Design a protein with these regions (language model features):
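Extended active-site neighborhood of metal-dependent phosphoesterases/phosphodiesterases
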Residues: 77-182, 256, 277, 286
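Active-site environment of divalent metal-dependent phosphoester hydrolases
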Residues: 16-19, 68-71, 97-105, 169-172, ...
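Active-site-proximal segments of metal-dependent phosphoesterases and phosphodiesterases across multiple
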Residues: 33-34, 168-182, 191-238
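Active-site neighborhood of phospho(di)ester-bond hydrolases with catalytic His/Asp-centered motifs
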Residues: 9-11, 59-65, 90-97, 199-203, ...
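N-terminal active-site segment of His-dependent metallophosphoesterases
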Residues: 1-75
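Non-catalytic terminal accessory segments
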Residues: 1-2, 298-460
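Acidic/histidine-rich helix-loop elements
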Residues: 11-43, 107-111, 170-176, 212-216, ...
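Conserved beta-sheet core of the metallophosphoesterase superfamily
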Residues: 216-294
Length: 460
């Protein structure tokens, strides 16, 4: 009996060279504003690659954003890591917009200063640079207007990988230009004619996972329903993507009844450092299991990955909540890529709220809501159970659940679920005509329960 084909997917390694700076005020602001790590990426990638090298997987597939911001030095260092892994495993990857710094804002940090004087890798040099991990083995390839490539490789007699570069669709969004899409159509038809299962991999999402409030807009390809319908109706059943840094599985069924299932892979260098192991079954279904990196070596010491990464993730919220100074608040908001100066104009009103949320318990929050006449509908029994729990503990748990694909699931009858949902429902009651407020309820439900699929272990 033939051995099942085994694939390992990872995404968003965002390797950052330490030569670009790892200390100082500006670095701290940048590092503290992101769910994923920065200076620690090299050590995390090394540990993950060692784990994968010792596994029984046949192929390692990387879904884009391999570098932090396209810095040449980061690419050079990352390729050396690939070369070491390649001694034991076959690797295929795609690049994405961070790999050629599409926003033209590469940075290096030195104390209180940040500089853009950083050499980056232009898009047209990416695929020659990563040639042995991309188009060398391609049975078909397509060069985009950026000089990047989509390509097809034969993974086994009956399985092919459709590796798609979706950086630009020519209309200001991620996706594919018309001729590019025609090439994709041809490859899907050829795979069907040859009796092969085609597994897709691209960087941007086809489906707004969890809810469009979280992964809509620029997180997805442009004209996403048109794109996913065309792919599914032409025979593509599975797509693996990155970009959102969220671990989540969802599907879409076209008006013609064709279903495409998409697995969104979280960032390898952020909580919970997911490694998605996939087995291709005899009936051409896919079974996946998500592993999380347990340990990595940092500054010569073995570090427990999960608490370290979870703290780094939740700190981006705590860094804002702990602001008691207008200038610090503006700097933190700016680091989150928002207009800190404009928001800080209202700091006089925001500061008391930050202070309250940062220190208050569920019981104190309930009293405050009751005083404001907003406690109607809050589950009192659930409040009592979590009366002395800090609000920030709830925020942390929700954030981590959104990112890790609900490793911990909450029953809809549990006190935790009832309390969160009754609080989340308050804005929709105040703004009854606001669609986004109603979406917030469905978003919270998906985060707490995990949604339609088991995001950690499932056959699709």
């Amino acid at each position: 009996m033939q051995k099942p084909l085994k694939l390992t997917f990872i995404a968003d390694t965002h390797h950052y060279s330490k030569t670009l700076g790892t200390s100082g005020r500006q670095y701290e602001l940048r590092s503290g504003s992101d769910q994923k790590c920065l200076a620690e990426t090299g050590e995390i990638i090394d540990a993950a690659f060692e784990k994968i090298a010792n596994s029984d997987t046949d192929f390692v597939l990387i879904a884009g954003d391999v570098s932090n911001d396209g810095e040449l030095v980061s690419h050079i260092e990352f390729k050396k890591k690939l070369d070491r892994l390649a001694k034991k495993k076959k690797i295929y990857l795609i690049t994405a917009t961070h790999d050629w710094c599409c926003d033209e804002n590469p940075r290096k940090f030195d104390g209180d200063t940040v500089s853009n004087d950083v050499e980056t890798m232009p898009s047209f040099k990416l695929y020659p640079f990563y040639e042995e991990y991309t188009i060398n083995d391609a049975i078909a390839k397509y060069e985009t207007h950026l000089g990047t490539y989509s390509y097809v490789v034969q993974l086994s007699d009956k399985v092919r990988l459709l590796a798609l570069n979706d950086d630009q669709n020519g209309k200001g969004r991620a996706g594919f230009k018309p001729k590019h899409f025609e090439w994709i159509d041809e490859q899907l038809k050829k795979a069907k004619d040859d009796g092969c299962l085609m597994i897709g991999m691209e960087h941007h999402l086809l489906i707004p996972h969890i809810n469009p409030l979280i992964t809509g807009g620029g997180t997805c390809v442009g004209d996403r329903e048109e794109v996913i319908t065309r792919l599914a109706d032409n025979g593509l059943r599975y797509m693996f993507v990155g970009h959102s840094h969220i671990q989540h599985t969802d599907d879409y069924t076209t008006p013609s009844g064709n279903k495409l299932t998409e697995v969104n892979i979280g960032s390898l260098v952020g909580y919970p450092a997911p490694i998605v192991n996939v087995t291709v079954n005899d009936d051409m279904t896919l079974s996946y299991t998500v592993e999380h990196l347990e340990k990595f070596t940092l500054n010569g010491r073995e570090t427990d990955a999960q608490p370290f990464l979870a703290k780094h993730c939740t700190d981006l919220v705590h860094n804002v909540l702990s602001c008691r100074d207008k200038e610090e608040f503006a700097a933190r908001i700016t680091a989150l890529q928002a207009n800190g100066g404009a928001v800080a104009k209202f700091f006089f009103a925001i500061k008391p709220l930050l202070k309250f949320v940062d220190g208050a318990t569920v019981g104190e929050m309930y009293k405050k809501l009751k005083h404001l006449g907003l406690a109607r509908g809050i589950d009192k029994e659930a409040v009592h159970e979590f009366y002395n729990t800090k609000i920030t503990d709830f925020i942390d748990r929700l954030l981590l659940s959104a990112i890790d694909g609900s490793v911990v699931k909450y029953d809809r009858n549990s006190a935790y679920y009832r309390l969160v949902m009754s609080i989340v429902s308050i804005p929709s009651k105040l703004l009854k005509s606001n669609t986004d407020m109603k979406r917030l309820i469905f978003t919270a439900d998906t985060i707490l329960t995990g949604g339609k699929y088991n995001n950690q272990n499932e056959t699709i």
